[in-house]
C-alpha cells in the first residue's frame, strides 16, 4: 500500500469526523486491489443468494411407462418402440423466480443430478431489457389482440428490476450471472441476448463475472430487413439489430463451427467447373507443398511434374485413381478437384443477417411478443453443445430454447416467473412431442415444477410467521405500497 501524505491523512480524518463517506480515491489508497478497472453501480454487493427451497412436481407430462417383464429387449434402451422415454433424465420446466431457482439448483440436491449429466454445457438467456417498460404483453388469439397485464409476482419482480432504471437491472443480472457461472460445466458457455440500450453495460458486467479473456464474440443479429423509420419522423438510422454476448467459463470451451450454404455468386465464381462424368460442380485446389522439406513435405515426380507436395506419393496415387487429380493444360502443374457437394459452406461470422425475426404468417408464431425464431436458437445450440448435452434458459418466455433443444436431442432446464410463459411453453412442448412421435423420433418426458408451497411468499417478502389474514394484508401492501389499510 502506498504511503499517505500528511494532507491525505488530514482529509481522511475530516471525512470521518463529519461522518461522510470517503471518496473512491481513498478506498484505492487504503485497500489493495489488483483490478485495473472496476464496475460500480448504486447498490452493488458481492452477496449472492444461497437459499435452497424444495422443488415440487406440479405435473409430469408424458410420464415414462413402467416396463413389462416380457419387454426385456426394451431394458437396454432409454426409449420404447414409439420413442417414449423409459428412464434417465427428465426435462424440467420450472415456475418461479429465477434467482431462487438458480440458488436451489446450485446448492440443493438437484445439483448432483445436473453433474451426472455432465453439467450445464450451454445457457442462453433473453432477459427483459426494455428499461422503463411496464411489461404488459400483447397476445394474439385468433384474429384479435389482447393486452396481458403482469400479475402481482411479475409486477413486483419488474418493479424491483427496473425501479432504479439501469442500476437495478444490472444488480439483478449480476447476481444471477454469478449463479449461472457456478452452474456451468468447465467447458460450458453462455449467450446473453441483449438490447442496444443495455448491451454496453451488460458486457462490462460479463467481463467482471467471467473475465474479459472469456469474451468470445459480441454477435450482431440483424433481426429485420425493414426500412428505417425516418418516414415516421425518426432522427436516427433504422434500428434493426440486437446483440448476443457469447462468453465461456474457461478456455476449454465446447465448440462446433457453423456454416451457411454458399450463395449463388460464390458457387458460380468458385465452383465454375463441371465434372464430365458426374456432372458435379467443383473447384481446383493446389496440391503443392509450400515450405518444402522445412515443412516436412515430400519431394517426388508425379505425372511428369517434379516438386514438393502436400500429400504422400501413395495418397496422391489414391486421389488420382479417384479422378480428383488434374494435370494443367501446360503439363507443368497439378491441382485437386474439390466438389461442391463435399463443401461445408461459408463459415458463420459474428454478423447474423440471414435469420429474420418471426413473420406475422410464420407457423412458429405463438403471439408471444418477444418470441425468437427457432433458427436462431438452433445455430447457438449446435455451435456450443452436442446431442445429449444439458442446456438451460432461465428467462424462457415462450419456450423456444426448450422446443429447439428437444428437436435437436438435448436435455434441458427452463424457467420463468410468468404463469402465461409456463402455460405457453407447456403447450408448445407437448406439440413438439407429438411432432417427434409422428416422425418416429425419440422424445423425453418433462415435468413442471415450482419451488414449493411458500416460494412466492418468500420471494415477495411476506412474513410467514403472520396469521393468514395478516399475510394477505401484507401482500396487498407490498403490491400497492401507497394504498391505506
Regions found by a protein language model. Give the residues of each.
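Conserved Class I SAM-dependent methyltransferase catalytic core
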Residues: 161-221
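Conserved S-adenosyl-L-methionine
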Residues: 60, 373-448
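Conserved proline-anchored active-site loop of SAM-dependent methyltransferases
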Residues: 118-137, 206, 391-405, 415
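N-terminal auxiliary segments of SAM/dcSAM-dependent transferases
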Residues: 258-343
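Flexible, glycine-/basic-rich loop-and-beta segments that form/coincide
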Residues: 226-291, 458, 466
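DnaQ-like (DEDDh/DEDDy) 3′-5′ exonuclease domain used for proofreading
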Residues: 1-125, 129-179, 187, 455, ...
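Single conserved hydrophobic/aromatic residue that forms the stacking wall/gate
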Residues: 476-485
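Phosphate/ATP-binding catalytic cores across multiple sugar-kinase/actin-like superfamilies
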Residues: 105-108, 176-177, 319-347, 351, ...
